[in-house]
């Protein structure tokens, strides 16, 4: 048993490659990728009990993001394009895969997210972007995850 280091859980975004196929590319140079479950609660108090009861009825997962803008980064370029062009609907949806490299066999979960930009340029030293990825459906466990380039890109099944 041991502690899991943050850099052992890495994220990949599906970005269209030059051939038009989706390439799951590592999300690098992010200063924040915080997952929030956003539980949907149902609370009530029954007349015959002196306390409240709360049940979880669902979830509204999000990932809050922030990054320092780097040149020639395909994931950042894609997010910046969505932000600058104010894309909406399906044009602002991407698949994100979270890979856990702390296990003996890497495990991966994928989910579609809407990219919800929030702010940009709020640092005096470097140009930054931030926002949220909001769940657009259920998460799916991937049967396998492989990489031929030290986890710069991945293939999933």
Task: Show where each model-derived region lies.
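Intrinsic disorder/low-complexity signal
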Residues: 17, 40, 47, 67, ...
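Mixed-charge, glycine-accented linear interaction segment located at domain edges/termini
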Residues: 110-157
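Solvent-exposed edge beta-strands and adjacent loop segments
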Residues: 1-70, 114-125
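Short, acidic/charged, Gly/Pro-enriched secondary-structure junctions
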Residues: 76-109
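Generic preference for hydrophobic/aromatic residues in regular secondary structure cores
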Residues: 10-13, 30-31, 91-98, 115, ...
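Beta-strand secondary-structure signal
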Residues: 62-66, 95, 130-134
């Amino acid at each position: 048993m041991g502690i899991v280091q943050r850099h052992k859980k890495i994220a990949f975004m599906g970005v269209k490659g030059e051939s038009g196929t989706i390439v799951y590319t590592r999300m690098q140079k992010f200063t924040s990728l915080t997952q929030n479950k956003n539980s949907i609660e149902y609370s009530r108090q029954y007349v015959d009990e002196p306390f409240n009861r709360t049940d979880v009825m669902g979830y509204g997962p999000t990932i809050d993001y922030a990054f320092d803008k780097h040149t020639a980064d395909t994931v950042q370029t894609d997010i910046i394009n969505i932000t600058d062009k104010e894309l909406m609907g399906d044009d602002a949806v991407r698949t994100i895969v979270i890979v856990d490299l702390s296990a003996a066999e890497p495990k991966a979960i994928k989910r579609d997210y809407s990219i919800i930009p929030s702010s940009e340029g709020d640092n005096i030293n470097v140009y930054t972007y931030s926002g949220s990825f909001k769940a657009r459906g259920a998460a799916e466990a991937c049967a396998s995850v492989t990489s031929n380039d030290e986890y710069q890109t991945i293939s999933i099944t």
